[in-house]
Amino acid sequence: MVTDQYNMERRRVFRVLISVSDKENIVDLARALHSLEIEIVSTGGTYQTISKEGIDVMSVEKITNFPEIMGGRVKTLHPLIFGGILARDSDSKDAEKHSIDFFDMVVCNLYPFREAVSKGVDLESLVEKIDIGGPSLLRASAK
C-alpha cells in the first residue's frame, strides 16, 4: 500500500479547494464534503455551481482579496492558495506569519483541450483552452 511504502499517515480533511472545468457530479461531491464539515473553497464557475445549490462555499477571491483577472486566466495563482497547498506541517510558523491556511485536498480537472482540437476551433480559442492553473494545482497537490 502506498501509505505504508512512504510512511504516510491518514489525515482528516478540514479544507478543500475545488476548481473544475467539467462540473459533472461536482455538486454531489460538494454536498458530501459539506456533510463531513469540510470547508469548501472554489473558483469562479465552480463556485457558482456549488453555491446556487445552497452549499456553503467560499470563493478564492475572498481568501486572496484579489479578483479573477485577465478574463479568468488568473484565478488560483496566488501565494495564499499555493502556500496553503504546498505547506508542510513544519511550515506552520511561516504560514501563520503570512495568514496562509492549509488545504488538505484539491479537486481539479483540466480544460478540455483535446476536445477543442478535435472540434477544429480557431487558434485563438485553442490557446484559451491551454490550462495553466489546473496543472499547477495538480502538481502542487502532488508535492
Task: Say what each PLM segment does.
Residues 4-7, 71-75, 93-98, 126-129, ...:
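A generic local secondary-structure boundary/capping motif
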Residues 11-16, 27, 32-35, 100-143:
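Internal alpha/beta core interface subdomains
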